[in-house]
Swiss-Prot record:
Residue ranges occupied by any MPN domain in the UniProt entry: 158-280
Swiss-Prot/TrEMBL keywords: Hydrolase, Metal-binding, Metalloprotease, Protease, Zinc
Name listed for the protein in its UniProt record: UPF0758 protein Atu1607
Gene Ontology biological process: proteolysis
InterPro entries documented for this protein: MPN (IPR037518), RadC_JAB (IPR025657), RuvA_2-like (IPR010994), UPF0758 (IPR001405), UPF0758_CS (IPR020891)
Highest taxon of source: Bacteria
Organism (species): Agrobacterium fabrum (strain C58 / ATCC 33970)
Length: 280
């Protein structure tokens, strides 16, 4: 049997990086794929531009931070808008990012600086750039503020520190998203014994149990009460149910020598006093 003539072999050494195949350089097919080089040079250029832009952005917001700190140092909080104070706080919480957009987004979402600090954790985390750690730190600031205000009425005659009572209650309750019923228990000198939340309900109602309130007052040897609850709607005007509930508590407490000094309703931008409205 005649042997087939040997075909000339192509040098396909591993160093070439290619293998012969159908439609390749070796059978005269389209050569564009072979001569197309990886676009490494343009990519390198793009990366260099991006890095430069990032450095410029970093220099800009670091300079902005310095300027904002200087304004605060020289002029105090009056020199800054709400979003700028929040931005200044976020510098510490988010050290390597431009925090102005986050601060503005928080104010846009919740309306005021106080509302930002009073917002629930899950809602804070819905804002882009605010993770759990940042949200917790914002709530920590709110807690510190409330403790500071509460210290202004501790061990003092509450009726003689009325503006401090209102400031504390507003900080603690104005931005709650559900109704909350709080009681300040006072001794016979009207000094604060205890500050307790007795109930928390829905957006427009919270259950109140007059007998439980009186029982707790007796346990604490309290002889006077200040009732406080919030209206998440923002309007502190007393409802008919608020008036009737207050009367029931007064009627339950009075035979046991416990006085209800006032019932305060806290709204977002103000408060209503039953005593001031001559409802008690």
């Amino acid at each position: 049997m005649a042997k087939r003539p040997a075909l000339p072999s192509a040098d396909l050494s591993p160093t070439s990086g290619f293998e012969a195949g159908e439609g390749d350089l070796f059978n005269g097919a389209d050569e564009r794929g072979f001569f197309a080089e990886p676009r490494s040079a343009p990519k390198k250029a793009a990366r260099a531009v991006t890095a430069t832009e990032q450095e410029a952005d970093a220099a800009h917001y670091h300079g902005h931070r310095d300027r904002l700190r200087t304004r605060y140092r020289d002029g105090g909080d009056a020199a800054l808008a709400d979003y700028e104070l929040l931005e200044l706080l976020l510098f510490r919480l988010i050290p390597r990012r431009d925090t102005k957009p986050i601060a503005k987004a928080l104010i846009a979402r919740f309306g005021t600086l106080g509302s930002v600090l009073g917002a629930p954790l899950p809602l804070l985390q819905e804002v882009k750039g605010v993770g759990e750690a940042v949200a917790l730190d914002l709530k920590l600031v709110a807690s510190v503020s409330q403790r500071m205000l509460k210290s202004e009425i501790r061990n003092k005659q509450v009726l003689g520190s009325w503006s401090s009572v209102i400031d504390y209650c507003h900080a603690a309750m104005a931005h709650e998203t559900r109704e909350q019923f709080r009681i300040l228990f006072l001794d016979k000198r009207n000094v604060l014994i205890a500050d307790e939340v007795q109930g928390q309900g829905t957006v427009d109602h919270t259950p109140v149990y007059p007998r439980e309130i009186v029982r707790r007052a007796l346990e604490l040897s309290s002889t006077a009460l200040i009732l406080i609850h919030n209206h998440p709607s923002g309007d502190p005007t007393p409802s008919r149910a608020d008036i009737e509930m207050t009367k029931t508590i007064i009627d339950t407490a009075k035979p046991l020598g416990i006085t209800v000094h006032d019932h305060i309703i806290i709204g977002k931008d103000g408060h209503a006093s039953f005593k001031g409205l001559r409802l008690i």
